[in-house]
Amino acid sequence: MRLRRLAGRRPRRRYVAFEVLSLDGPPPGKGEFEEALRGVYLKAFGAESLALARPRIVYYEEESGRGVVAVVRDYRYHILAALGLVRMAGGRRVLVVPLRTSGTVKGALRAFRSPGAPGRGGV
């Protein structure tokens, strides 16, 4: 006999591709940026929302400042707002630009390709 989960379905996740533009030198490291994002999210939406959203950085290029953050689907607009509110990370002034929201990491990573790159439809 197969056991059923009583709690319901596993929450779906969305992946938001973003780019960090640093005004003071190189972009911050992954840990510095994740700490700044969590702090802004906590201040804007509270501890309960932060716990339910479970934001985490699944991909981050420290040289370019590009990355992907995973979040529970119901909180995707919260993470977009929090990304826009991040102004300091690792002691540097930064501006975070959300590029694309996707249902898969692979789809989010496509946002980093150049517009004429293969697989993007030449758009």
From Swiss-Prot:
Pfam families assigned to the protein according to its UniProt record, in alphabetical order: RNase_P_Rpp14 (PF01900)
GO molecular function: ribonuclease P activity
Keywords: Hydrolase, tRNA processing
One GO CC term on file: ribonuclease P complex
Signal peptide: none
UniProt key word Hydrolase: yes
EC number: 3.1.26.5
GO biological process: tRNA 5'-leader removal
Catalysis performed (reactions): Endonucleolytic cleavage of RNA, removing 5'-extranucleotides from tRNA precursor
Tagged with keyword Transmembrane helix: no
UniProt xrefs under InterPro entries: Pop5/Rpp14/Rnp2-like, Rnp2-like_sf, Rnp2_archaea
Protein family: Belongs to the eukaryotic/archaeal RNase P protein component 2 family.
Subunit: Consists of a catalytic RNA component and at least 4 protein subunits.
Entry function: Part of ribonuclease P, a protein complex that generates mature tRNA molecules by cleaving their 5'-ends.
Protein name, as recorded: Ribonuclease P protein component 2
Origin species: Aeropyrum pernix (strain ATCC 700893 / DSM 11879 / JCM 9820 / NBRC 100138 / K1)
Lineage: Archaea, Thermoproteota, Thermoprotei, Desulfurococcales, Desulfurococcaceae
Gene from which this protein is expressed: rnp2
